[in-house]
Amino acid sequence: MPPARAQTLPTPITVPPPPVPVAPYLPFPQFGLLPLDETNNGFGFAQATARAKKLQARMQWIDATANLDRINTAEKVKVVVAAIKGAGFTSICFEAKPISGEVLYDSKIAPKIKSFAKAGQPVKTLPADFDPLAAMATECRAQGINLVVNFNAFAEGHQLFGTGPGYANPQWQSVLYEEKPVLQIPFAAGGLPLAMRPNELPLAENEIAVYTDPARVSADIPKRNPQTAFVIVVDKAGTVVAQTLGTAWQSLSVAIPDGGAALVSQSTGSSDILRRFAAVGVRLSVQSSPIFVPIGQRPRRQVPLMTNPFRQDVRDRTLAIIAEVVRGYDIGGVIFDDRLRYAGLDGDFSPEAKSAFEAYVGKPVRWPDDILRFGYRFPTMERTMTPGPLYDAWLVFRALTLRNFLADTVRTVKAIKPQVTVATYVGSWYPDYPDVGANWAADDFAAGFRFLNPSYQQTGWAGLTDFVVTGCYYTTATIADAVARGENIGETVEAAGQFSNRAVNDASWTYAGIQLADFKNKTPDDLKRALQAAGATTQGIMVFDFSHDWEQWRPVFVDAFKTPAVIPHLAPDSLADVRRQHAAKKAAGVVDPPAILYRGKSGTGF
């Protein structure tokens, strides 16, 4: 045996206490002291520059359809602009192309919106001979407001109403990949189509509905053929534990087991098969196969009718609409809303996407297996996803496609009017965005996310823009507030704004978005605290939306914005200075401290 090595035993060490936290920066000192994390909030050259030069964006968003009755005459537009300016805002974001693909200006390319109505609300109309964008541009120029025009890039229809040019042009629509499930019953020939979405009445009558919520069974059976409905109850292994007529469901003594489900047929043929072959004790299973469907055939999937970014005609159309506006109207900037993305991880799986991806990786691919395969946990029908060998390459490829489209947009805009700014709006919870292909961070942002490999990192688009707005849509203002209430600290304006600023990483200006609808049952002080946190963590504030009881909150804005500030994206050379300082720090080998990865709420700002 070799001689034992001498063992080094641990010894006590001494560690000095951390420095006392520095006093927080308060963009609105009149609102009073707020417990803010200045060490992390003040990070970066963009923050330092904005504070030193007294730069702060103050942007009011005007949603097209929600405000249609407020901007459908020249006089109304004048009143709206005056109200916003009088409250201290210095920029207006006006939506010219909403998700429907119908525009709010006189276009030679896109149809003009005529009216809009939600259930239970009066119809809002737009006179055919009135151009709201022209009136908005005129008033913003006259009243000294920076006008930024909003476009929903890859949306050409409203699925709640079936309106928009994407319906007349189905070839534009995003193609979704789905796994079509089939219920397998021993000794029954073939199988029965199974609904993909649990606890919903399927659109197709021949599909077997799946419920984990017994109340939904009771609610849905009367809606369609209750006399022919048949119900079987299965446990978590898929074994039938009960069966009954739909009309007798309410009196069934067997409850849905934990992890189990009720399967409901409402067509005569399917009900007969279940009755004959799915007896108590029989174990059922599910098989699935991939199908590819245009999003217009899935109206429950999401409200916007998303289009296919891999199609040249779709990209060209969007660029042509933007060029038409930049060329024809006196505007200060353009911004893409949150539809500069794909429909989800399930889209786009069109032939164009397959061809472009094969060119990207340089070989044929098994479609969709090399990328991913969806599946289901039977009987609850929870969707599963298994990555394929090219999954990481697929995420990079999708993000690269959108990044390059944004670069095309910047070139298009600047070639017409170099002074017009280009920006993007996104939700603040960055880990949502690989699924939809939008890498809104800087191309040198590093953080501990599985998807953020060196290739994906390079697809970051922040540096292409003049500013990035992130939806920090929370009502809890500060991290300290969340700690005191026992809440998740990531679901705060401060954490969202702080992370957004770190992700953009001096590549552009960062503005924090606040959603007024979230404050419906809150107090003016709650909104003041949110504005304070937004202004302390980023270089500006965007307020969404003018339709959200705006007049109720106007006194808060008047108080907040009474001290003038310069708009960062209009400050000569300031962003260039920020970028130069950042580049010099990198060249000197200075390594930034790790970004704090707060757990935000999925879907925030979408």
Regions found by a protein language model. Give the residues of each.
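Mature N-terminal, pre-catalytic/accessory segment of carbohydrate-active enzymes
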Residues: 2-94, 138, 183-260, 267-270, ...
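Glycine-rich, aromatic-flanked loop segments that form ligand/cofactor-binding clefts
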Residues: 35-48, 89-100, 132-197, 226-229, ...
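Catalytic domains of carbohydrate-active enzymes, especially glycoside hydrolases
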Residues: 75-102, 328-332, 458-470, 537-541
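Polysaccharide-binding and catalytic clefts of secreted carbohydrate-active enzymes
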Residues: 83, 169, 174-193, 246, ...
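Substrate-binding cleft of secreted/luminal carbohydrate-active enzymes
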Residues: 455-605
